[in-house]
Amino acid sequence: MDAHAKVLEALRWQADVTNDPLTAGVLDAAHADVFMGGATWHRLRPHAHLPTGAALALRLAGAAHRLALAGDAPAYAAHLPTCGGDGDVEAARAAFVALMADDRLDLRPVQTNEPGRLAALLPAFAAVHERTGLPLRLLELGSSGGLLLRRPEGIPVVGRRGCDPNPLDPSNPADRLLLLSFVWAGDLPRFRRLEAALDAAVADPAAVDACDAGTWLGAQLRGRTPGVTTVVFHSIVWQYLPPTTRQHVDLALAKAARRADDEAALAYVRFEPGDGVAETRVTHWPGGDERLLATSGFHGQDVVLAPR
């Protein structure tokens, strides 16, 4: 597949699966402009080599949204609900394509921290605690700003720590802007929820280390930690990890699993894509048994608990 066809496919797929009409609309307009060889094609052509998992269309939408949120794209912002705009999809399409000639567009790697996913993760944390009776030590891969490293109500947590190759600081205005820019510009409730989660993380911060997930997890799981259940978790992260990092994560878990016992248990919780939905799965050690705990939307909405 040549570069032009690859970019067209990336935009078409993202526009089709995005359930925010405004974001779907501007990506559809971008697709049409790329097809015609317009400014959007010239903007994206240098990035056409990126793999599918790099989410090129979301990088583009986030870059435009970031300019609007910063006050640097008023014509586009006028139509974005997240910027107080009117939500006019047709007007947003035209303004988006016009913005493609702006050299301030910065197609950063997608970095999200969706607090709504806690709705699907909390049942897993509760199930792990119910099974072991031990307080939890939470270790998150791909933590971003650490917004999911909260203290679940009613579940004792004795440690919270995460890692990310590029951790973001919820108290830093530039980092807040980056996270907010990857929310769909027409989804105001989700945008407000993220703002509230950023404020909560500032009030009760969790440590997030700048490190490769495989290297970091190997170090975190090196010793036995009696009296707690160590919970390794991640949410919509696996697709972004390089193959070598995935192998190192699997190896670290396998080594720790061999040491796990009833006094120092281990659980692996993941919220990742399934068949058209997100699946929350947990594997417990000792034992190594795996369960599907819940399905939901990819932002943690519409959680359905699996039968026990």
Segments the model singles out, each with a brief description of its role:
Residues 137-141, 233-234, 267-272:
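Extended hydrophobic secondary-structure segments that form protein cores and membrane-embedded regions
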